[in-house]
Amino acid sequence: MPSYIRDHRKRLRERFMTGGAAALPDYELLELVLFRSIPRQDVKPLARLLLDTFGDFNRVLTAPVERLAEVKGVGEAVITDLKILEASAHRMARARVMQRQVISSWDALLDYCHTTMAHRETEQFRVFYLDRKNVLIADEEQARGTVDHVPVYPREVAKRALELNASALILVHNHPSGDPTPSQSDIDMTARIRSACEALGLTLHDHLIIGKSVELSFRAEGYL
């Protein structure tokens, strides 16, 4: 490895350890990740290329494997390390909300939703199942869809609640466009799930739509 690359890596690591992530712009933080994947090359051009391609650090981590593989210079090692980092972030955020009362950890729940869903390029539909004390007992992905639609089956959602011995649930899905405004199909689907829940004595607390940097609550906006 050329000495200038070795010295640059050393300085960057020292800045990170001294000032934390806040001391580094996105491309330098991404460089730190790439140091492990590509141990003997200058990774700054690749870091900048990834950011130019996907937009920001979060979108690089959450980019589909197929799209990452299309970027020149990205191999299996890079993809693996990026996806390990993404999975770690998801797991940390999830740990803050599982087996906890939703009301007391609402901000953490929203953070988890944004971490796992805000930067997806296609729609994903999740259900949070709660017990009688409103403790989150299960977080399950029900369906994945296209850029503007995800198929959801109300009876399956309600049936799964009974299997888990849940008493209430919260629906969550993302809008890849970044705008969390509900479509008419979102409203209609929520109404069908609410009816299925009521028929079984279940409570639908809310339906959250996750945008790029903001969420919409059906309950707060009067849709429920």
UniProtKB/Swiss-Prot annotation:
GO terms for biological process: proteolysis. Zn(2+) binds at residues 173, 175, 186. A motif (JAMM motif) lies at residues 173-186. Keywords: Hydrolase, Metal-binding, Metalloprotease, Protease, Zinc. One of its GO terms (molecular function) is metal ion binding. Residues 102-224 form the MPN domain. It comes from the Bacteria. It holds the Pfam family RadC. InterPro entries: MPN, RadC_JAB, RuvA_2-like, UPF0758, UPF0758_CS, UPF0758_N. Gene3D superfamilies: 5' to 3' exonuclease, C-terminal subdomain, Cytidine Deaminase, domain 2. CDD domains: MPN_DUF2466. Belongs to the UPF0758 family. This is UPF0758 protein SPO0054. It comes from Ruegeria pomeroyi (strain ATCC 700808 / DSM 15171 / DSS-3) (Silicibacter pomeroyi).
